[in-house]
Every structure is written in C-alpha cells, then in structure tokens.
Regions:
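Conserved phosphate-binding elements of NTP-dependent enzyme cores
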Residues: 1-950
C-alpha cells in the first residue's frame, strides 16, 4: 500500500492550487483561520473524492439511492483510502433516536432482556410463567354464559410479504375463514396483499357460544389454535369488547394477563409490538400549554389575558366576550378577578369547556335589540387544539406549534414502552430503568449482574458488547450522558464524539477518518482521554485528519498542516507543514505564533464591575439542583464547567427562554426555576449562534445586515434610474422586473443528472449576474448593481465612502474580520464562524440601548485562536456599550478574558448541577474544587495584561 496520500493542484473553493503530501497512518491536524480553506481541503476535497470513488464503483441502479458527491476541483489524488467523515452537522433530529440507539447499545439491551429477562405481571407484580390449556379453558368459561366468541390462531404477525403460500396451506388444512389486518374473509378468496406492507393474518379456528357442556370442544379448539400459531391464541369476544390474548409462554394466573413470547422487537419503542400505544413510543405528547396561552396569570378576563388567535379580544360585543360573560354569570365570578384567584372549577371551564352543558348567552344587536341563545362552551384549549388540527396553512401550523409543549405520556410516564414490557427485569431493573442510567452508572450496573449457569452463558457475549461500547463512550468524555437521552438534544460536539465512539467499536483499519473539531464542548479535563482515543484509532492502522484549533490536540498530532495566511480570498495557501515544533518555528504561521507564545489573547488589567445583577432563584431544570445564581449585567460573563454540568440547562433553558418570554414576548416554556429577579434592567435578549444567516443561495451578507436595501436606494437615486422610472424594487433579484427571469435571479441553473450528482451552471442569459440587461445598464460610479454585489467588504468601504450609513455597517463587518467576504456571497458558503461574525457585526452596527442581553453558546466553535482574539474584542465592545454578554465556553483563552466566571459542576450528569464557585477568573483559580480553576491558573499566569478599553 502507498505510504502517502499525494494531492496535486487542489483548487476547491478558495484553495490556491497547491500540492500536498500527507503520511498515512498518522494523526494530522488541519488548522488556520476561520474561512481559510481547512474544511474545503478536508471535507470538500479528501472526503468528497474518497466517497465519490466508492459510490462510482457501484452499479448505476445502486447509485441512484445514494447521495452523489460533486467531483472536487483537484488535478489528482493518489493513495486515497475509503473515507469516513465524522462532523458536527449530521446530528439526528429524529425524536426516536437516543444515545442508546445511535450507539447500538439499545439493540444489545433488547437482546439481553428478550433472552434472560424475568417477566412480571404489570398489574400485581408477581413473576409470571407459561399458561396451560386447562388454565385458558377455565378463564374463558368464567365469562358469562351465552357469550359469543371466535378463536383465532395468529400465523403472521407484522411481517411484510404477499403470504400466498401461507394462505394456500390454511385452505389445504380445511380452515374456511381468516382475519387479515382486522378484516374477516374467506380463506379461499383472500385478497392480494401488498408486498411492501406489514400484515397480520389469523386463522379462525372455531366460532362458538359458551355453555356448560362446551369444555371438550373448547379444549380441542384451543389446542388446534396453539399448534397452528406456535403457542398463541386470541379469543375475539365481539364488538365493543377487548380481545383476550392467551399464551403457552407467559401469563399471570391471578390477573389473567398474558404476554407474547419475548423477542428483541418486544423491547423496541420503534416497533408496534413494544411501543406504548398512547404515545407511539415517543414517551411524550404534544399538547397546548396553558402557560404559553396565558403569559400572565395575574390578569383578569377583562384584561385580555389570552395570547392566542381568537381569544385575544374579550370585549363585550365579541363572541369570546359573550361566552365569558355567560360563564361569569353561571359560575358566579367577576370578569375583573385575576385568573390565578378564580375558583378551580371556574378556571377549568374557561380553559377546557363546559363539557357539553349549555350556557345562556345574551347578545345585543347593533340596533339595541337583545337576543338570548343557548350553546355549550368548547373551552379555550380544546378550541385551539381543534383549530390547530384543522388548519392547512404551514404558517398557521407553525404558530400553533409554538403554543404547544411536550408533556410526558400519562400511560407509560415517558418510558416509551408497553406496561407488560416494562415489567420485564434484569437485575431488578426494566430496560427503561437501565436506559435512564448514565453511561458510568450503567457500566457499574452491568458489571454487577449475576446469572445462573444457562442464563450466564447466554448473557456473556451480549454483556461483552454492551460493556465495550459503554467504555468507548467514557473514553471520549461522555460518561455523564444517559442512554435514553434524545439524540436531538445533543450538542454538535457530543453527537460527533458518539459517532467517534461507534467507529472505535467497529474496529475498522485502513480507513481515512476526517473529523471536525472533536474537542468542541469538551472540558480541558477530558481532553487527554479524547486524544488517547484518536491515537488508538491511528495505532490500529488508520489515517486521521482532524480539523482542529485546540492546542493540546495540535501538540499531540504527528503533523500539522497550516492553511492561510488569512481567510476567504486572503487564504487558501499552504503556509506550513510539519510537527508542532516546526510550526512554532515558522515565522509566517499565525498558528505557530500562538503555539509558541509569541502572540496571545491579552487579559484586561482591571476587570469591569457589574452594573447590576439578574438573580436566578431555585434553578432545577434537568440536573440543576435547586441552585440560586447571580448573573452580572453590563459585563462579559462566562458559564463554565465540565460537559454535562448544567451550563446549557441554566443559560439556554432557564435564562434565555425566560428573557425571551418576558422581554421579547415569545412563546417559550423555560426550564424549571422559582423565578428571575432584575429583568426590568433589560429591554431585549438576543442569541448569537453559528447557524446559517440564510438557508438559500438568495440570502447573503448584504441582505442579512440590511445593506442591500440602502444600496438599492443609491441605485434608484441615480439619474439613469430616475429617467427610466426605476424604483428600489427594480434592483432586487427576488421580484420580477429587474431580475433575470431565465434563472429567477439565482444566477445559476440546476441541471439534474439522475445517476450523477446534480450540477450547477451559470445562467447563459445573465452570465451569473442575476439581473436583466436593462437593470445592469444603470451604473453608479461606473459599476452596476451586480458589480457591487461582487465587491468585497474592503472594496465597498472605499466605493461607498460618501454614504455614512452604508460605511457604518461595512466598517463593523470589516472590524470583525470579514473584510474579505463579498457582499453578494451566498450564505450557504459561509462557515459557522463567519455567519456568527456577520450577526455580531449586525448587532454592533445598531444603535445600542445599553439594555440588551446577549447569549452565546460556545462561540469559539470553528474559530482559530486569532479569530477568538477578534471575537473577544467585539464582545467587549458590546459590553462597553452597557450591554450584558453571557457565554457558555470551555476555551481557556476566552474564559481568562471575561470579567466574571460562573463555574458549575463539579462533575457531569447526576454529579453536576451545583454552583462550584463564582467571581473573577482570578477568584476561580483560587477555588480548589473547580476543575476550570485548575486548568485556568497556569494559562492566566503567563498571559499579558492590557488596559481595559473603557
């Protein structure tokens, strides 16, 4: 096998056509500024080409079912292995995906419980075993005499196929009737079944009426049914009655509850055989939330307390007002009484209706005539639920979704499974109880299990697989997660490390792994364990390319590839390649300057004093342990702690959602807490994350920041535009008139290639300029609107120097390090760090009220340390304007530059959720219990200090 991966002439995106040789079976870090071309090289070139070559080796029939990747712009790549990408963008949002299912631990748990689980009666709790035919007969004869029933033998249960042979055998055996998917029909004339659908087929063995002398016939029929089905028989009692299921396998003799033979699918909440029928295995139900439709329970009906369409106006003449007036008369309460002081009965009627009982409603016509009619009151919540179910509008559905919240299923209490399945235990715990354990606790639980000789032989290989996967999760720093944790609630870093743990479990060799910042979301304490995992993958014979900015990972790498020197058009060059020491010695490498200590993020000489406080009382969302926390205002504050310590629960679930609800009037349901004091010091809350600034190629930095509106006004004010009668909308590529209609203003056309990836070509009519010829003839300072959109921020600053409002917005984009991006650059091509800085620039360009609360969740994701220095400067600007900045962060270089630190922990999961310490970074370093303080102290000690910009 070739010893190196040799890349020649790589020009993907902004890469400048350089050659690169990468050693195989090494740990290689790609680094450089945000937008320099790291991801273009790692993912868009190496991974894309590795994947493309694999897919092209398949048949054209197979290729149409796989996402075909575009051929990267590169002359050649030799020595390329099959590539596996582990990034942060493919987190599953499926509500059925959990940590257990993603890692396949749940699959092994299902097998374990099906093979060695002990079944119990879900009603009385006693251990249950197989039923005899005599017990079945006695149960049926206990029914009222003259009861009509039919005995059914299930021969197909939830299996796909046409089942022609099975039905032919039924006829040959002399049976006349079958029940197919709930419908009785003649066996000889059974309908053709859909091959791709799951079906249930039951043979009608006997139809009878219960009498005293029927025991012998009943016994014979039961034995026939049991032999046909393999031990299961259904007694169909008739319409309106529930069927009785009997099993030779498992049944409670006391309660008469029977269970089917336990199989792995019985323990799956994604299978109808195991899922709770009420919530379909989701564990939760979507319901209209009273707290979201009544933001303030201290308001009376006369103060219009309902924040929902149709109920927001309760004036006497409105339909809603008439109903509530009738309710107040019937139940004897005043329309001026606050809702939280109304009798429970009256409040229940207002919210949930009169239960069909009519009300006498008085109506006065405009001419003064009075009219009375009777009608039941449906209730605010049932009416809203009905309207949500009936609407066909996506926008209206989204509106009603905002009024709903998830509530635990009342039947399974959030456990997702049927009660009889939850009654099966191993080591005294149900499969749901075992899944609710953290990974660390689960490892201890499975290690403590003991079995008899037979069960021990069955369980041993299953437990070996479970324990191996649990150990891999602990090795990547995820020991605090529970196996039942929904995959959609994981951060990008957590999801990526789960996939990394899964890959370790697969034990593949000879593979090219490409990872995107695996250290994100990981506390410095757990870094060594993660690096050990990466080295293990390398040592068993794989090549690892890691896009990373973490100092520890770079120092542990066999080789570093530094791309730069700048970002966008100023990047895309190979600056340096070699060991960490060689990179440090390279004078052209910005990365080397920071690694060697020649450059660093400075620390303010004097920390800014808080201008006020938010007091969070009794925070207990998720694992928070009823803590009181004071959040400083007017400064740059950071919440720290190991992964799973409760940072996101405090900041995102409690603080941000409460401020959104109370300041921004948003439909949110904050995490559990007693309240937050001090909100009157703020006027709005804004979250600045790394999500794209737009989802389509039409959105760009100019449209997002509001620059494009101003630029269109400039063009509409030119003499040529006025002479032609062009208004501002003429210069929009989103509406008819000025845009090129051949491409609808996109500038590109999508060509569908069927068995190959779709390709995008410039529009032949406008040549990619988006506008028609007439619009492009209007010039300002010799440039058309298309020319302006193609300018960089740096070029536009000089071009629009006569317009202060435009230059102010452009200057903020330049100040946050985005001078290289083009005004019309598609938002889909911006990195997460670039998108975040566009949002920050937009905020900086606004007139500050000094009362804004900014929330940032790990803003350094994807940022080089030089980008982090610029980010800290921008955040300080926001704080120096009187605003408050609250960050969740693990990056020690950012933590040391903050004014105030709130450290949660001490551990993750159940071992976290407490306030370890709070104060300035210097105070945190003095706290012996703080892991953050232990790692922050040496970093703070060697940092240079500067005067604050106040």
């Amino acid at each position: 096998m070739q010893e190196n991966i040799i890349i020649r002439g790589v020009r993907q995106n902004n890469l400048k056509g350089f050659d690169l040789t990468l050693p195989r079976n090494k740990l290689i870090v790609f680094t450089g500024l945000s937008g320099c071309g790291k991801s273009s090289l790692a993912f868009d070139t190496l991974y894309a080409e590795g994947q493309r070559r694999y897919v092209e080796s398949l048949s054209s029939y197979a290729r149409q079912f796989l996402g075909q990747m575009e051929k990267p712009d590169v002359d050649s790549i030799d020595g390329l292995s099959p590539a596996i990408s582990i990034d942060q963008k493919t987190t599953s949002k499926n509500p059925r995906s959990t940590v257990g299912t993603v890692t396949e631990i749940h699959d092994y748990l299902r097998l374990l419980y099906a093979r060695v689980g002990v079944a119990h009666c879900p009603r009385c709790g006693r251990e249950i075993s197989k039923q005899t035919v005599d017990q079945m007969v006695d149960r049926l004869l206990a029914l009222p005499e003259r009861t009509r029933m039919q005995l059914l033998a299930p021969i197909v249960r939830g299996k796909k196929g046409e089942h022609v042979k099975i039905l032919e055998n039924v006829v040959k055996q002399g049976f006349v009737r079958v029940r197919i998917d709930g419908e009785i029909c003649d066996a000889a004339e059974a309908p053709a079944l859909a091959k791709q659908k799951k079906h249930n087929i039951e043979v009608v063995v006997d139809r009878l009426i219960l009498r005293e002398d029927i025991r012998a016939r009943l016994t014979d029929s039961l034995e026939t049914a049991l032999s046909l089905s393999g031990g299961i028989v259904i007694a169909d009692i008739g319409p309106g009655e529930s069927e009785m299921l009997f099993s030779q396998n498992l049944a409670c003799p006391e309660c008469g509850i029977s269970m089917e033979e336990l199989a792995p699918r019985s323990f799956s909440f994604n299978s109808p055989f195991g899922a709770c029928p009420t919530c379909a295995g989701l564990g939760v139900l979507q319901k209209i939330d009273p707290d979201l439709i009544v933001p303030d329970w201290g308001k009376s009906l006369n103060e219009n307390p309902f924040n929902v369409m149709g109920w927001s106006n309760l004036e006497p003449g409105t339909q809603a007002g008439m109903f509530f007036q009738a309710l107040s008369e019937k139940y004897g309460f005043s329309m001026d009484t606050p809702l939280n002081r109304l009798p429970k009965e009256a409040l229940d009627v207002i919210l949930y209706g009169s239960g069909g009982e009519p009300l006498n409603i008085h109506y006065t016509r405009p001419n003064g005539d009075s009219h009375t009619f009777s009608a039941p009151f449906e209730g605010v919540i049932p009416t809203t639920e009905r309207r949500a179910a009936e609407t066909q509008s996506d926008a209206t559905k989204a509106y009603y979704d905002g009024l709903m919240s998830q509530t635990p299923c009342p039947d399974c209490r959030g456990k997702r499974l049927r009660p009889e399945i939850l009654a099966v235990t191993v080591g005294g715990k149900s499969i749901a109880d075992a899944s609710d354990l953290s990974v660390i606790d689960a490892q201890a639980f499975f290690a403590s299990l003991t079995f008899g000789e037979k069960d021990g032989m069955i369980a041993a290989p299953i437990l070996k697989e479970i324990n191996a996967r649990l150990r891999f999760l602990i090795d990547v720093g995820l020991g605090y997660l529970t196996l039942s944790r929904a995959a959609g609630t994981l951060s990008g870093g957590e999801a990526q490390r789960i996939r990394l743990a899964t890959q370790i479990g697969s034990s593949l060799v000879g593979v090219l792994y490409i990872l995107d910042e695996p250290s994100i979301g990981l506390h410095q304490r757990d870094n060594a364990r993660l690096i050990g995992t990466l080295k293990h993958l390398r040592d068993i014979g794989n090549t690892l390319i890691v896009v990373e900015h973490d100092e520890d990972t770079m120092l542990a790498a066999d080789q570093i590839v530094d791309i730069g020197p700048g970002a966008g058009e100023h990047g895309g060059q190979l600056i340096a390649q070699g060991t960490a020491q060689e990179i440090m010695a390279c004078p052209e490498s910005i990365t080397g300057a920071y690694l060697s200590g020649r450059r660093s993020i400075p620390v303010p000489l004097h920390r800014k004093t808080p201008a006020g406080w938010l007091a969070v009382r009794g925070a207990r969302a998720n694992n928070l342990k009823n803590i009181d926390v004071n959040i400083p205002l007017g400064v740059m504050a950071v919440v720290t702690g190991v992964s799973g310590s409760g940072k996101s629960s405090l900041v995102n679930e409690i603080i941000y959602k409460t401020l959104q609800r109370d300041l921004n009037r948003a439909h949110t349901r904050p995490g559990a807490c007693d309240g937050i004091d001090g909100l009157e010091q703020l006027d709005k809350v804004i979250a600045i994350d790394q999500s794209p600034i737009g989802r389509t190629p039409r959105s760009n930095p100019a449209t997002y920041t509001g620059l494009f509106d101003m630029i269109r006004k400039v063009f509409a004010a030119t003499p040529e535009a006025k002479a032609r009668g062009y208004k501002e909308n003429r210069f929009s590529f989103n509406v008819r008139g000025g845009r090129c209609e051949a491409c609808s203003g996109d500038g590109i056309l999508r060509i569908e290639m069927h068995f190959l990836a779709d390709i995008y070509v410039p529009c032949e009519v406008c040549k990619g300029k988006r506008y028609n010829r007439e619009t492009l003839e209007v010039l300002y300072k010799g440039k058309s609107i298309a020319d302006v959109l193609n300018m960089t921020v740096e070029e536009a600053l000089d071009f629009f120097s006569a317009y202060p409002r435009i230059t102010r917005k452009l200057q903020t984009l330049y100040d946050v390090g985005l001078g290289y991006i083009r005004l019309g650059q598609s938002s889909t091509t911006l990195s997460g760090g670039e998108a975040q800085r566009v949002k920050l620039a937009t905020e900086l360009s606004r007139t500050s009220t000094g009362k804004t609360f900014y929330v940032l969740d790990e803003p350094t994701t994807g940022l080089h340390i030089a980008d982090c220095e610029r980010l800290v400067r921008v955040l300080r600007q926001l704080a120096h304007g009187g605003n408050s900045v609250l960050i969740i962060e693990h990056n020690l270089d950012v933590i040391k530059a903050c004014d105030y630190v709130i450290d949660l922990g001490p551990e993750g999961g159940s071992g976290g959720g407490t306030l370890v310490c709070e104060g300035t970074p210097e105070d945190i370093c003095q706290c012996e219990k703080s892991y953050t303080g232990q790692y922050l102290a040496p970093v703070l000690k060697k940092s240079r200090r500067i005067e604050s910009e106040d």
